[in-house]
Amino acid sequence: ALVVKGLGIGFFEAAAEGGEEAAKEIGGIEVIYTGPAATTAEAQIEVINSLIAQKVDAIAISANDRDALVPIGKKAMDRGITVISWDSGIGEDGRVMNLDPSNTALIGSSNIKWMKNSMGDEGEFAILSATSQATNQNAWIEEMKKEFAKPEYSKMKWVDTVYGDDLFDKSYQEALGLFKKYPNLKGIISPTSVGIVAAAKAVEDQGLVGKVYVTGLGLPSEMKAHVKNGSAKQFGIWNPIDLGYSAVYLSYQ
């Protein structure tokens, strides 16, 4: 089973495509693509309990909370189920392996560099993340702090970090809140494919294109229009299809 942070997110749907591709190559296995409607650890635990009851052979989880999912991971392993985490890790005691999407330090430093390239080397910016417990986003933000401490960013001011919980509407409202709280804001870094689109849409709707620039991690298919209209100059991502493919192969091994 491929368990994602939340259903209806394009990044994870692309990962599921890769998972299906791996399943076809392996042969004789079925991939159950599932996840909660709410992007919380509690909702994921319910999903995993259901999978344990179904006696699946393996569970590959992108975690909403590194620590809160350890007990349910242990429970699954005690039942003979292989548990790995991918994209966003579970604590070591709750899985046998973790698959990171890319180099954590590279992701963190790149986001700060993209922000500087987008807004210039002075002014205010903020972070719009996923959930406050998300393993991957929190690790990337720690790496952003290391990069941001370098002297070339001395005229830039990191004013806030807010959380949209990987929900479009909440992320959009958080972006609006940043505009209101920081009228001189020049940039938003959103290291989540949901948040970056929501932030770019908020910039456009508020007539702030050319004043506030959005960067972070997003899908090209979802960000194309926002780059064309100027709300985002640059952003990055790895291939989620390959990530899902690798997660299923590792689960099978």
Label each region the model flagged.
Residues 1-253:
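A residue-level marker of the well-folded mature domains of exported/periplasmic proteins
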